[in-house]
Regions:
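Ribonuclease/tRNase effector modules and their secretory precursors
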Residues: 1-95
Length: 95
């Protein structure tokens, strides 16, 4: 419910969230355990970034992406911890 409330608050559609997960401009470690945060910049007069935080849940064979939250960051955020390449390969196989 939290992610749906945030999507409504920031006027983000499900397809936009899926697009951010499939084609992120930047991917970092999330603040929760095993969390992944990915970002895409928005186009417009004022620069902002849309972030999605999710975790990979389930068994190795039946992996699923569970969206924790999404938000719009006003401005440019600093680069933080990148995701290891093995996890990125696993995510690309799911999507």
């Amino acid at each position: 419910h939290h992610a749906h409330d945030k999507m409504r608050y920031y006027r983000l559609s499900e397809s936009r969230i899926k697009r951010i997960i499939r084609y992120p401009s930047r991917t970092e470690e999330g603040i929760i355990e095993n969390g992944i945060a990915c970002m895409q910049p928005t186009c417009g007069k004022i620069y902002s970034e849309i972030w999605v935080m999710y975790i990979l849940s389930g068994l190795v064979i039946e992996r699923k992406i569970k969206i924790i939250t999404c938000w719009r960051y006003p401005g440019k955020s600093q680069n933080r911890d990148p995701i290891p390449s093995e996890i990125l390969k696993e995510i690309h196989m799911l999507v």
